[in-house]
Amino acid sequence: AIALLLGMPLFVFFGALSDRIGRKRIMMAGCLIAALSYIPIYRAMQQVAGSQVVTAVSQRNATTGAISLTPQTMVNGALQPAKEVLPYSNFGSFIADPVAWKLILLVFIQVIFVTMVYGPIAAYLVEAFPAKIRYTALSLPYHIGNGVFGGLLPLIGLWIVAQTGNIYAGLYYPIIVASLTFIVGSLLLRETRHTLIWDEIK
């Protein structure tokens, strides 16, 4: 929540910056930087949080249906027995952890990527389509992108983690989507900064 509050002014900043240097350039840069940075950021978050687990896989007994946790593969390659989830009463100690600000910083960095895309995107979508089809042309791809690709992120990400046993594997989905957006957007999308939407009604 703190990282989101700190990042709110950046929506305005990148929106205003796109008026000067172009919307496409900022949005594509946000996608590219995010795709390249996700895994390093989440590795850093794992280390800051004090967890060295790389893989954790559970197995179900085919006869009894009981679930057992396999040893966890640590960063140094050692195997360690899986631990039980801490009771809720212990979570208070995490809130007062002195490294919390580092986690906030790492989340804030990701918020910057979001604002680089979402700051200019409203103006970009309005300028990209003529007035006669703007409502449908703007809302349909926007909501497909958010509803389908974004909405399925937890499901697909968790499925990838479950299939591979690697806690970072779920990041492959947003990385692939961001990379494809950068490639397709860089090659096919036009810059709209100089589009004057009011000229259509003159």
What is the meaning of each model-derived region?
Residues 126, 132-164:
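A late C-terminal transmembrane helix in Major Facilitator Superfamily
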Residues 1-16, 30, 34-42:
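Transmembrane alpha-helices of Major Facilitator/SLC transporters
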Residues 38-48, 176-202:
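Multi-pass alpha-helical transporter architecture, strongest
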Residues 4-12, 115, 147-151:
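Residue-level signature of mid-helix packing/kink "hotspots" within the transmembrane helices
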Residues 20-31:
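Cytoplasmic membrane-interface "Motif A"-like loop-to-helix N-cap segments
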Residues 42-105:
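Low-complexity, proline/glycine-enriched hydrophobic segments characteristic of transmembrane helices
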Residues 2-7, 110-111, 142, 177:
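Transmembrane alpha-helical segments of major facilitator superfamily
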Residues 116-129:
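Intracellular juxtamembrane helix-capping segments at the cytosolic ends
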